[in-house]
């Protein structure tokens, strides 16, 4: 919620385009905008895609959303029931009509609890970032339910920005709620890897080139094709 990353946008979209998927990139509002601005933008993007499904050659019942880091929190917010009331009341949109059919997450921010990435919630909530009721509301693991679509998630065990416990808590919550989830935990790699290759490393930052992680788009493709 501090920024949107070029490294996690077009290069990833082109990977999935090459695999035969229609792709869209949302540049949502970040700080100083606060909740629910980004969520309403995501909901409107989903509404627009489904409204133009025939023209854009999209199956409206096979729309997945993919988010990285704090963008993963936004994607999960849209996919779960966390923001339903805000989407309905402030966006004038039926939340069930814009819920994705699949949720894909890369090193996502999930919890606002012990293992939170505090900066994300500071950007999301501003001076309300210490409001415990809001922190509970935006802890995604507390809101996984029957409306949550199937989930694909990956994380690295050595992520020093968004702890892997975020994904572990998501796995536990999905299991408890009976939500299908495929999870991949890689042994090494810093936060923000994107495709984990030279294309997305940026400025010679070789720590973002991690060979064992580079398979995740193929794993995600296989998951999507099994699902749809």
Question: What label would you give each PLM region?
Answer:
Residues 140-148:
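Conserved serine/cysteine hydrolase catalytic core
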